[in-house]
Amino acid sequence: MPNIKSAIKRVNTTHTAEERNISQKNEMRTAVKRAHSALESNADNKADLLSFALKKVDKAAQRNLIHDNKAARIKSSLMTAAK
């Protein structure tokens, strides 16, 4: 455990950011899974789920939670499944 005040604050900040990042990444993964399953089952709301998943993937890449190339691969697989 750090003794210096700024180091203590930094640990707290890092912990908070880590929780936020994990939460946002999990939301993105869930959205992608729901979109894939909706596209496979030809659900009525597949367009909404697809756009929501693409939005989540773009935001994750923008926030550097995932690499830009990974975001492109995910979006490509979703769009291919949508055809």
Swiss-Prot record:
Disulfide bonds: none annotated. Coiled coil: none annotated. GO terms for cellular component: cytosol; small ribosomal subunit. InterPro entries: Ribosomal_bS20 (IPR002583), Ribosomal_bS20_sf (IPR036510). Residues 1-25 are annotated as: Disordered. Keywords: Ribonucleoprotein, Ribosomal protein, RNA-binding, rRNA-binding. One of its GO terms (biological process) is translation. GO terms for molecular function: small ribosomal subunit rRNA binding; structural constituent of ribosome. Residues 16-25 have a biased composition (Basic and acidic residues). It comes from the Bacteria. SUPFAM superfamilies: Ribosomal protein S20. Binds directly to 16S ribosomal RNA. Belongs to the bacterial ribosomal protein bS20 family. NCBIfam families: S20. HAMAP family: Ribosomal_bS20. This is Small ribosomal subunit protein bS20. The gene is rpsT.
